[in-house]
């Protein structure tokens, strides 16, 4: 996946945002200090609140739990969730109640949920750049490892994987894919009822809406600042006009929307829909390998780029097993764990590491083989709008179309 950035937040600007912190951060721990963290972690149980909507991800976390238990004596419990916002509410309530041994030790997070926890001082840290494995993170090539939805991370969450909005279709049904949001409207008009997107606030649905917002605004500068009512009103004029034109041509005339991208993928596989969407550029290749999609399915990204980001793990300020959580975060960043996560036979989630920083033996863990269904021509990753835009955008969408 490329990590070129375009338009308002250019690659040069993104690099500038992180270059000032390329030196070893003030909070970096010595080897002795890290050994003390590992010693205190032994025997702890880490309750990792993470989305459970994928069998592959669940299986990966089971594998990680076994490795962490054997190597570090830390028990990893996957608390399966469907909505990270609910975890944020729980941590907020526990902190307000003065509970110092909270029920959440680690949470899979990014975007608006990270922004909320950061603003409300609900996060432990900074800790991320003190992790021994952080030295291999590609902070220059993948600037979103330090900038989360235009919000500086500041060591309060550890990068875990990369994501970029990607579409896929069956070449037998869609020989030429629409490569822009304008082309998507033309495609929907030509193929009524065969296109849709998940209902916001589903993550993939909100991402589709944000992609349209970004693409339809020639001047994107306001999107990368904290949202205001005036900025929201101005920036969404072309968005609502576009969606008003698009929806009558969607599945069920835009009166109903599927609840998830998984549902859309199944409907596409069954022939009911023509195009599906994902935030994992390797998802179609995964599904082809598992015989759940035809090998005539191909993946693509829009010509002007698509939204891309990093997903992270963070430790709540009242976590009971802070040392154990740091050990887990460090393991998840290790070359062995990142390589297994990137393996299409396992999860297929792109790595946050700079492979050229690794010794040859660890670099060899990462496969360079191209498989059917992978993105043939990766496009630039466009930075996500500031996290403060998400909630008001979703609320306005629901008011208009929900």
What are these regions (language model features)?
Residues 251-314, 357-365:
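Extracytoplasmic/periplasmic substrate-binding proteins
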Residues 33, 266, 371-402:
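Conserved C-terminal helix/tail region of periplasmic/extracytoplasmic solute-binding proteins
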Residues 1-26:
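N-terminal secretory signal peptides
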Residues 51-63, 78-86, 103-262:
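Extracytoplasmic ligand-binding site segments that recognize negatively charged/polar headgroups
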Residues 34-42, 49, 54-75:
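Short, polar/charged alpha-helical segment
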Residues 124-137, 157, 185, 289, ...:
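Short beta-strand->loop
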Residues 306-307, 311-377:
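Mature extracytoplasmic/periplasmic domains
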Residues 8, 25-44:
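C-terminal segment of N-terminal export signals and the immediately downstream linker at the start
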């Amino acid at each position: 996946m490329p990590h070129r950035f375009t338009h308002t937040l250019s690659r040069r600007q993104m690099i500038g945002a992180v270059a000032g912190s390329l030196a070893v951060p003030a909070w970096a721990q010595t080897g002795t200090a890290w050994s003390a963290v590992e010693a205190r972690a032994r025997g702890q149980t880490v309750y990792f609140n993470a989305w459970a909507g994928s069998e592959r991800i669940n299986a990966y976390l089971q594998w990680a739990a076994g490795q962490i238990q054997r190597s570090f004596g830390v028990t990893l419990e996957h608390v399966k969730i469907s909505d990270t916002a609910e975890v944020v509410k729980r941590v907020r309530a526990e902190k307000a109640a003065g509970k110092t041994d909270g029920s959440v030790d680690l949470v899979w997070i990014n975007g608006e949920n990270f922004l909320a926890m950061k603003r409300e001082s609900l996060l432990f840290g900074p800790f991320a750049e003190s992790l021994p494995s952080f030295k291999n993170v590609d902070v220059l090539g993948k600037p979103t490892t330090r900038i989360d939805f235009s919000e500086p991370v500041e060591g309060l969450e550890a990068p875990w994987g990369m994501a970029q909005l990607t579409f896929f279709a069956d070449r037998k049904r869609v020989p030429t894919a629409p490569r822009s949001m304008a082309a998507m409207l033309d495609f929907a008009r030509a193929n009524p009822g065969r296109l849709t997107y998940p209902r916001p606030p589903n993550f993939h649905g909100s991402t589709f809406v944000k992609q349209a917002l970004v693409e339809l605004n020639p001047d994107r500068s306001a999107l990368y600042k904290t949202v205001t009512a005036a900025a929201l009103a101005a920036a969404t004029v072309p968005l609502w006009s576009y969606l008003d034109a698009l929806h009558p041509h969607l599945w069920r005339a835009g009166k109903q929307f599927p609840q998830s991208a998984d549902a859309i993928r199944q409907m596409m596989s069954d022939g009911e829909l023509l195009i599906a969407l994902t935030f994992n550029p390797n998802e179609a290749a995964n599904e082809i390998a598992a015989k759940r999609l035809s090998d005539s399915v191909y993946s693509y990204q829009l010509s002007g780029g698509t939204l891309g980001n990093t997903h992270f793990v963070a430790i709540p300020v009242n976590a009971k097993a802070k040392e154990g959580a740091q050990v887990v975060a460090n393991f998840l960043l290790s070359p062995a764990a990142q390589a297994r996560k990137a393996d299409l036979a396992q999860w297929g989630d792109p790595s946050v590491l700079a492979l050229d920083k690794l010794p040859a033996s660890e670099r060899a863990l990462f496969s360079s083989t191209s498989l059917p269904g992978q993105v043939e021509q990766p496009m630039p990753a466009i930075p996500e709008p500031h996290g403060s835009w998400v909630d008001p955008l979703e609320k306005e969408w629901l008011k208009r179309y929900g």
